[in-house]
């Protein structure tokens, strides 16, 4: 092999090695990001024995997940109704009309949104107002007395529940 040919071969080999060193982690990140996109992680909300039965309570908790290349940690809240120590309904705190946070009115036994006066029953159905669909439930599970939630965000202002 001529000296010039050897140098070309050597430079090509170094370029391939350099490409692998830089490219493999990048491709791995893209693949893992694509695999987890749109899938929320389970977040620990708290012990169920501290929650009252049959009465909605708003609970704040820290949720975490990966979006694109970034690990994020957010402070979120959910509305929880414990039907028993092993069964709960968890609502997103976001009104399905335009995204305000609603509250529970204990006196009237209903959820009320302060922005445009949508009113929801204890089971989340719309009683009055412009909300186009019932309150959004979140996936929840109870393991060893601890409630976990998959915190997701949904499109507002539409009759269909769509994760965003
Ligand atoms: S945002 Fe709740 S009623 Fe409009």
Kindly label every feature range from the protein language model.
Residues 106-110, 122-125, 129, 143, ...:
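Beta-strand-rich cores of mature extracytoplasmic or soluble domains
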Residues 4, 93, 122:
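Short alpha-helical basic/polar micro-motif
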Residues 109-117, 127-136:
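Short cysteine/histidine-rich metal-coordination sites, predominantly Zn2+-binding motifs
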Residues 1-7:
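Twin-arginine (Tat) signal peptide motif
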Residues 100, 117-120:
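Flexible, glycine-rich terminal cap/loop adjacent to redox cofactors
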Residues 59-64, 119-125:
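Short Pro/Gly-enriched beta-strand edge/turn motifs at strand-loop
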């Amino acid at each position: 092999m001529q000296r010039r040919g050897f140098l070309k071969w050597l430079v090509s080999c170094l370029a391939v090695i350099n490409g692998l060193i830089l490219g493999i982690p990048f491709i791995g990140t893209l693949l893992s990001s694509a695999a987890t996109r749109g899938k929320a992680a389970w977040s620990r909300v708290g012990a169920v024995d501290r929650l009252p039965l049959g009465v909605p309570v708003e609970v704040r908790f820290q949720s975490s997940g990966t979006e694109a290349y970034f690990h994020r940690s957010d402070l979120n809240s959910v509305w929880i109704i414990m039907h028993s120590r092993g069964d709960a309904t968890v609502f997103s705190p976001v009104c399905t009309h335009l995204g305000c946070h609603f509250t529970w009115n204990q006196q009237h036994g209903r959820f009320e949104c302060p922005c445009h006066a949508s009113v929801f029953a204890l089971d989340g159905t719309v009683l009055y107002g412009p909300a186009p669909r019932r309150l959004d439930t979140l996936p929840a599970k109870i393991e060893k007395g601890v409630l976990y939630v998959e915190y997701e965000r949904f499109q507002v202002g539409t009759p269909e529940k769509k994760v965003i």
